[in-house]
């Protein structure tokens, strides 16, 4: 249960009970009332700004109104004390019995504690990675892959019906270049000396194997075909090979998509999907024939000094109108974006999230304009931009390229430090802030390494369970037994740990609402820190040890507390896509 939502309802009920009315009549607007943990834990357990946001409407001084509300809240049987602070904040301190009761709820819910119905089954499409199928994934793709994957997991946990999607850019000019590059490697595999890879082609050694496979399958047959026919075969085989490589890289990072959508699908049957999308926009008055003025600065690739078929995107929030067709009659890449969005919308998605690299910042307004025009403003589109990742080793910068045509790949990073450190650390900054990734720091066993610190807390929980088996003979811990004596948890440090656990449902919902999965990584670190501190208190003070052999009821209660910590760590790490270890190796 989200205790903050619970007290939000209690506070609003209290406002009704004291018959609080606007001075000008009508109903009070309660939408701006906030209920959250105080910034300073010493101020209490629950804080609300109710008096400050309502004072003007009711015509009363904020502190006087706060005192009036506070007095009424004291009647709540779960409230120990209520104080008014500052300009009119109301701080509530709750009774230990309330926290003990909530801990029992958490224990009974297990790893489902924190799961929310916020999304109410609403369909959401999260598109992420969508790297061009021209080679292995480099480390720059890594952050978007993790952010998108964890956000999708988070939204699922918050009650949304989520589809994870990858858009395969397999219809552009870069694919023609890729096919020619592989054709060269095919000839090389047949024994031809190809010399230096010509400028403009892909020089990477990863294409050598594709050329060899083609030589093994076709022998010299491709050389005997018309070039266009041969290149079409090479293109298909190469895209399949590149996507197999990309899927393997993503699998190593524990990133999995539900849908791989080929751009070429939009171009079948004379690009029927694109034509239909443009026709729909035309019927809505969003398409016209016109001439764009030359933009200031560097000219974009799709600008031409002629009359063009244009999307009237400035009327739906964009900076300039966008060309839909080129001078040769083919469609612009943007026209494909329109058709792809329409395809998603037609599949029943009213909410779409695009996770893109920071270099795609110029796409945000045009994509938002497409969403408004295609859906008549009914669909919600969000673009999350991921800033660059800089690699370091012991504080020294690491070059991103290894040699000509080669670069540090996602697989290089995962193979060196492991999947879990990569996933966790890619979340340890908000996606729109640059991130430094130090190979040495993410593998050190210290508090300064967040992923180690969190996973170590999980392992410590299980070490407590093993101690319970050794010292108390409790091999199979029973949740009913563990939850039957929570009234014995009275030490302030234990109640403080319960408070931290109680924040989890609110954290899940707020991270989902704001689409900020990094909040989960920060919370897990804070929870781990609280648990490690409690462990250390037991080391310093025998009365606070989790297991008291001479007091089995207290031991069971504390084991129940440890079980909930373990459950929340497991839940959060599962959403992040990392393991919750039972022991550290």
Curated annotation (Swiss-Prot):
Its EC number is 6.1.1.19. GO terms for biological process: arginyl-tRNA aminoacylation. Keywords: Aminoacyl-tRNA synthetase, ATP-binding, Cytoplasm, Ligase, Nucleotide-binding, Protein biosynthesis. A motif ('HIGH' region) lies at residues 131-141. One of its GO terms (cellular component) is cytoplasm. Its main location: cytoplasm. SUPFAM superfamilies: Anticodon-binding domain of a subclass of class I aminoacyl-tRNA synthetases, Arginyl-tRNA synthetase (ArgRS), N-terminal 'additional' domain, Nucleotidylyl transferase. GO terms for molecular function: arginine-tRNA ligase activity; ATP binding. It is found in: Cytoplasm. Pfam families: Arg_tRNA_synt_N, DALR_1, tRNA-synt_1d. Monomer. Belongs to the class-I aminoacyl-tRNA synthetase family. This is Arginine--tRNA ligase. The lineage of its organism: Bacteria, Pseudomonadati, Pseudomonadota, Alphaproteobacteria, Hyphomicrobiales. The gene is argS.
